[in-house]
Amino acid sequence: MKLKPNNILKAVLLDFGGVFAEEGFRNGVRIIAVHSDVDPDIVEKVAFELIYSTGFILGKCNEEAFWKAMKEATGITGDNQKLREIILNEFKIRPWFPKVVTKLREQGLLICLLSDQTDWLDKLNNRDKFYQLFNHIFNSFYTGKSKSDPGLFDDIANKLGFSPGEILFVDDYHGHIERAKKKGFQTHLFIDKESFLSDLLKYFDL
């Protein structure tokens, strides 16, 4: 596998949950809802709202405050640490993806994680040791900006030192893809392994 001669691609940004790994947050909060005998659809909706509105995903509040808000808003119950473990257990790295990352880096590309996450990402790395696969880890908990903020994409391009058109952004959420596209990034809306690998072929000669 080699980059096509006229290809300008310099870097690839991968989302974590929903791309590099299974979407553990959504799956986890739905399991928590079932355990608490609460409607999973309601808990999922509220969880995604609160992880942003409390500021937890931007590092502006701690985990205890997030779970307090969740329990008050939805009626879920349980020890905070056990609730967190339910979610973390649902983040499962797709077994084929590390090899793809390695092959892309062998072509001289910068491969980065760009994730709306909390310090849970660090805990997942302690378990699965995946940070070493990437050139950079951009986690909203530390950057203070989420992918809902279009300015984040300017920051990333500046940090990497590449023009937006030299960066491929891969995410499973259409809204994030559209924001990146408007900033000039190349994009791929992740649906499954087959369509992702097929889309990569336009950048490479096999």
Question: Where do the PLM segments sit?
Answer:
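Substrate-recognition "cap/lid" segment bordering the active-site pocket of phosphatases
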Residues: 119-168
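Conserved acidic E/D residue at the C-terminus of a beta-strand in Rossmann-like folds
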Residues: 171, 191
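N-terminal helical cap/lid subdomain that shapes the substrate entry/recognition surface
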Residues: 3-98, 106
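Short, solvent-exposed loop/turn segments at secondary-structure junctions
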Residues: 19-20, 25-26, 117-120, 143-144, ...
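Acidic, divalent-metal-coordinating active-site segment for phosphoryl/phosphodiester hydrolysis
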Residues: 152, 172-185
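C-terminal cap/substrate-recognition subdomain and adjoining C-terminal extension
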Residues: 162, 183-187, 193-206
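Glycine-centered short loops/turns at secondary-structure junctions
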Residues: 106-108, 184
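Generic structural signal for small/hydrophobic residues in well-ordered secondary structure
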Residues: 15-18, 59, 104, 113, ...
